[in-house]
Amino acid sequence: MNISELKSKFTSISKLKKGGQKTVYKASDFNGQVVALKIIGNATDPRVLQEISILKELALNNIPKIIDSGTVTDEMINEDALFIIEQFINGISLRDWLNEGNKANISTAFKILHTLLLIEIELEKNNILHRDINPNNIILGDNGAIYLIDFGLAKKLGDSSLTQTAATYGPFTPGYAPHEQFANIKLAQDVRTDLFQIGVTIYECCTGTNPFIKLNDTPYQIMTKTMTLMPPTLILKGDAKGMFAHYINMLMAKNQSQRPDTAYDALRYLNAIKSTLKLED
């Protein structure tokens, strides 16, 4: 089957975005189901194959489900490509929401944080690290739900690594990855790596800016600030005792040992401070 034949299986199809070797479409099949169709240029890309494997293993309401996947021929260049058909999420990315000038109040921040921790608990049960939690990969659904997407950097703990041990840097998104990730310290990467990223993401939700990124910063400058800069403490209406701000600082701790040991611990700590927060219903 080639790409044109694959597209013919849908009654309507429109391109949403293209980046690198991946093109994403919104499509409707003959049963009226709306799906996301992804076509990736390299059919042997190990990270994409790993992402497919991980997503097929997971069955969580807050992660888009894979409906089908396989290999298809790109007739333009006569080479194989991968395709993924997955659940389509109506909504807006957290990145686009922030780019519209929005900032999260204490209630919205708590909801996003609480949902991400529930997802992280399930990932931890399955020995999976996402490793790329940031506003680009969080969808605020039109139905009020919050979704975590893009498992392209995800890692199954215990599996062989796709990055050479001798490599100076591991795969990461600057400004969100902690030191143990971008420095490619493989044995140190665990759930606390994801918790750091969650902390930075929530901080950015509340302030509108990533504390480690300024315009025109190089990746090296961002990494240096991630290791050395202590972000200004959050000041949020509804956090009179500063417990939420302290909690976010704990997630963003430079020293891994100062972050919660597990996602469950992180959720337990969050629930323990909930009574100090003035949350809207």
Describe the function of each predicted region.
Residues 165-181:
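Conserved activation segment of eukaryotic-like protein kinases, specifically the C-terminal portion
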Residues 65-82:
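Short beta-strand micro-motifs within the conserved protein kinase catalytic domain, predominantly
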Residues 77-93:
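Conserved short submotifs of the Hanks-type protein kinase catalytic core
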Residues 112-113:
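Activation segment signature within eukaryotic-like protein kinase domains
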Residues 45-57:
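AlphaC helix of the eukaryotic protein kinase fold
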Residues 120, 124-140:
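Catalytic-loop of the protein kinase fold
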